[in-house]
């Protein structure tokens, strides 16, 4: 009986008939979140937040704990799947004008920032060579903040260098932040259902809606099943595809890796940071690469919501997708020509998308009026 009541609530939820597969990534993100929390709990049970024991505890979990290798790989590959889903979810929001539901978009961008922080803290926990040096480089950017930077960095590190207190803090933050993500996700979903989902045409859906259950529940379940299948296949055949070879060595203060880089899902922001040959400028560009998403609802000047009917913005959108991939690629390369030049051009084009939103919207309105 309780299950019938839950399904009845879903049945009462009206959804536009024409929403496509791109609208399924929200439920996939919810599944990823649940999976990460469950696997994270089992990993935390066997983890030791100590610089001398952290790396050994990871090896112990992989070798000696029953199904520990599966939990570890599910958690690591689950994080990559989480970011793949969130980037597609955001791209859909940008393309179809979902950002015009301002509160939902702003809460979603805040969620992205929290998620990136959580993933960064988690990347440091194995205390491998790349974990340690990525943490050193990224946290050191705080020193670029005038007046407060050095104090903030010392507070975050728990001393004058990354050491045992740093690892303890990062573990505590990695454990507590997901609860904030759950709370903010609930708010995000509540704000979304105040107005309802948009649709590919960007029109009002009130005239043509169907119940969420059974139509969209089966569609969601199909996409979730496909995602889990891809994850399990990756874990079975390519478990280390996203891992850096340097991270299979314990952190060593005396040896610097040839090329320090974070996980693949941060490479676009890291590439933007590296494209500016100035510490403060790079740190600001890094922050702006995410923060600029907050401006999108306020720079929309077009009369049409979706990019389906906006050819100029479509061109800019696909340029944005291309620059995202190019910046990610250049960030994996050494800091030398021609990669620095490519990275600088791609970073400029990345920010151009957000700045052109205002002008191109106005231009498209003018063209539409002329045609009429």
Curated annotation (Swiss-Prot):
Q: Which subcellular locations apply to this protein?
A: Mitochondrion inner membrane
Instruction: Mention any Pfam family matching this sequence.
Output: Cytochrome_B
Q: What is this protein called?
A: Cytochrome b
Which example biological process does GO assign this protein? Answer: mitochondrial electron transport, ubiquinol to cytochrome c
Query: What family does this chain come from, according to its entry?
Result: Belongs to the cytochrome b family.
Any coiled-coil regions, as ranges:
none
An example Gene Ontology molecular-function term: metal ion binding
Detail which positions bind a ubiquinone.
193
The alphabetized UniProt keywords are: Electron transport, Heme, Iron, Membrane, Metal-binding, Mitochondrion, Mitochondrion inner membrane, Respiratory chain, Transmembrane, Transmembrane helix, Transport, Ubiquinone
Additional comments on file? Heme 1 (or BL or b562) is low-potential and absorbs at about 562 nm, and heme 2 (or BH or b566) is high-potential and absorbs at about 566 nm.
Q: Where, by residue number, does heme b b562 bind?
A: 75, 174
> What does it do?
Component of the ubiquinol-cytochrome c reductase complex (complex III or cytochrome b-c1 complex) that is part of the mitochondrial respiratory chain. The b-c1 complex mediates electron transfer from ubiquinol to cytochrome c. Contributes to the generation of a proton gradient across the mitochondrial membrane that is then used for ATP synthesis.
Sequence intervals crossing the membrane: 25-45, 69-90, 105-125, 170-190, 218-238, 280-300, 312-332, 339-358
Task: Provide the gene name from the record.
Answer: MT-CYB
One GO cellular component term of this record is: mitochondrial inner membrane
């Amino acid at each position: 009986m309780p299950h019938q009541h839950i399904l009845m609530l879903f049945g009462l939820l009206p959804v536009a008939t024409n929403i496509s597969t791109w609208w399924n990534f929200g439920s996939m993100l919810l599944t990823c979140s649940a999976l990460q929390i469950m696997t994270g709990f089992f990993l935390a049970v066997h983890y030791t937040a100590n610089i001398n024991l952290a790396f050994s505890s990871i090896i112990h979990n992989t070798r000696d704990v029953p199904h520990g290798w599966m939990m570890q790989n599910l958690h690591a590959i689950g994080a990559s799947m989480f970011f793949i889903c969130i980037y597609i979810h955001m791209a859909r929001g940008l393309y179809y004008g979902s950002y015009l539901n301002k509160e939902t978009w702003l809460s979603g961008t805040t969620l992205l920032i929290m998620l990136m922080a959580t993933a960064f803290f988690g990347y440091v926990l194995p205390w491998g060579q790349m974990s340690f040096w990525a943490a050193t480089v990224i946290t050191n950017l705080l020193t670029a903040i005038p007046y407060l930077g050095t104090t903030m960095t010392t507070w975050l590190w728990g001393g004058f260098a990354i050491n045992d207190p740093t690892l303890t803090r990062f573990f505590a933050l990695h454990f507590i932040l997901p609860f904030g993500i759950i709370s903010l996700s609930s708010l995000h979903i509540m704000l979304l259902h105040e107005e309802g989902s948009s649709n590919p045409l960007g029109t009002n859906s009130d005239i043509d809606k169907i119940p969420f259950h059974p139509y969209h529940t089966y569609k969601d379940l199909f996409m979730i099943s496909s995602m889990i299948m891809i994850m399990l296949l990756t874990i079975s055949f390519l478990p280390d595809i996203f891992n850096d070879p340097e991270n299979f060595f314990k952190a060593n203060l005396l040896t610097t890796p040839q090329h320090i880089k974070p996980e693949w899902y941060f490479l676009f922001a890291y590439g933007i940071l590296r494209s500016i040959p100035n510490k403060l400028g790079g740190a600001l560009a890094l922050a702006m690469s995410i923060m600029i998403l907050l401006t999108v609802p306020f720079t929309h000047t077009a009369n049409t919501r979706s990019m389906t009917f906006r050819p100029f913005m479509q061109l800019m959108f696909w340029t944005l997708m291309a620059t995202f991939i190019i910046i990610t690629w250049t960030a994996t390369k050494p800091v030398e020509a021609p990669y620095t030049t490519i990275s600088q051009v791609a970073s400029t084009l990345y920010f151009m998308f957000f700045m052109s939103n205002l002008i191109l919207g106005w231009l498209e309105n003018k063209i539409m009026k002329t045609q009429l």
